[in-house]
Swiss-Prot record:
Keywords: NAD, Transferase. GO terms for molecular function: NAD+ poly-ADP-ribosyltransferase activity; tRNA 2'-phosphotransferase activity. This is Probable RNA 2'-phosphotransferase. It comes from Pyrobaculum aerophilum (strain ATCC 51768 / DSM 7523 / JCM 9630 / CIP 104966 / NBRC 100827 / IM2). Belongs to the KptA/TPT1 family. PANTHER family: PUTATIVE PHOSPHOTRANSFERASE, TRNA 2'-PHOSPHOTRANSFERASE 1. GO terms for biological process: tRNA splicing, via endonucleolytic cleavage and ligation. It is an enzyme of class 2 (transferase). Its EC number is 2.7.1.-. Pfam families: PTS_2-RNA. InterPro entries: Ptrans_KptA/Tpt1, RNA_2'-PTrans_C, RNA_2'-PTrans_KptA, RNA_2'-PTrans_N. Removes the 2'-phosphate from RNA via an intermediate in which the phosphate is ADP-ribosylated by NAD followed by a presumed transesterification to release the RNA and generate ADP-ribose 1''-2''-cyclic phosphate (APPR>P). May function as an ADP-ribosylase. SUPFAM superfamilies: ADP-ribosylation.
Amino acid sequence: MNDVYKCPVCGQLTESPTHCGVSAVKILDGAMRLKISKLLSLALRHSPSVLGLSLDKGGWADVKTALEGLRKAGIRADYEALYAVVALDEKGRFELKDGKIRARYGHTIDVEVEYEADSESKVLYHGTSRHLLPSIMAQGLLPMRRRYVHLSPDFATACQNARRRPLPVVIEIDAECLRARGYVVYAASGKVRLAKHVPPECLKKVVDCPTPS
């Protein structure tokens, strides 16, 4: 992950070392940003006890407790660092509100997060590995241990996800097909869409991810 800077003129957080025509102040290095993000994902999605958290029904945890948990894990993070991780996350993984923090999606634990329905997207994408295609084409996309299937609104994001595995490919999905079969498509963030299941008949085609230049 990139370093995070704060502009001394306007106060905006940025990944650029310059802003408003002046040098910005580095407040968080990329390595620490990644560590915080990974620990928050683990605790808020799967295992709250990792940071000593207690989640309510909506998946919210106390920010002060989260910061204390990070410190006990050897990460000296203050609220500004935590806010930077949340605010600059390109996939909108986290949410801060009224002294609480939660993961927006990706849970394997039993929480209830309300999402707005996406009624506009016509095509969605899912990044995966070519060797998984036979089972996907037979069963469709299943949430597995998660509560929802994760989909992307654009090809590039799906490819980015697919490249975590060997032989990355992207499956193109007919979103109207999903709706016609009674499946709601939810917008979890600007970069993430969710559905309970994607049946085989809604899978349109498979495209290889291009090699990054």
